[in-house]
Design a protein with these regions (language model features):
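Extended, charged alpha-beta segments that form solvent-exposed binding/catalytic grooves
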Residues: 2-7, 13-14, 20-72, 76-158, ...
Length: 167
């Protein structure tokens, strides 16, 4: 049987499209294990959408957690040198409480992180990648940019392929 992207499920096609987009932009894939030391999440509770985290004691006695977030792990392990900008993308499962069912849910999440020397050019790249990501998914979309400085710099980068409205 010959491989064809057309035979993939929509989620798989989306993942391939976004991976190609991010790698073409120079981002590297970040992969982490399922578990992270609970202390990382305890120290950064205000960053998380919920303080509820699935924890367990590992065989060596460390308190571990099923990851509720990927950004914190990337920030902890990716250490850019002064002046360096690192760009990572990820496709990971995270574990978060569901308000509707009052249980934990496993959520497939794909995202992009820029760390280090992040200036105007990197912000422009990230926002453009966000728009291109939404476009690659094929549905109608609206990208809201809430910082006027970012918005003005985006207007100056190139001719938009979509109309830009400022309200």
């Amino acid at each position: 049987m010959e491989f064809s992207i057309a035979n993939l499920q929509p989620k798989e096609r989306a993942s391939f499209a976004l991976r190609a987009l991010y790698e073409a932009a120079g981002c590297r894939k970040y992969h982490m294990g399922r578990f992270e030391e609970y202390g990382l999440y305890q120290e950064n509770r205000s960053f998380l959408s919920s303080e509820q985290v699935i924890t367990f004691t590992d065989l060596d006695g460390r308190l571990l957690a099923l990851k509720p977030d990927v950004t914190l792990s990337i920030a902890k392990t990716a250490q850019p040198t002064p002046g360096e900008t690192l760009c990572y993308y990820y496709h990971e499962n995270v574990y978060r409480p569901s308000a509707e069912s009052h249980t934990f849910k496993e959520i497939s999440q794909m995202g992009l992180e820029m760390l280090g020397a992040v200036g105007e050019a990197q912000v422009q790249q990230a926002v453009c990648l966000a728009a291109r990501s939404l476009d690659a998914l094929g549905a109608e979309w609206v990208l809201e940019v809430s910082h006027m400085g970012y918005l003005l710099s985006l207007i100056h980068i190139s001719e938009p392929t979509r109309p830009i409205s400022i309200s």
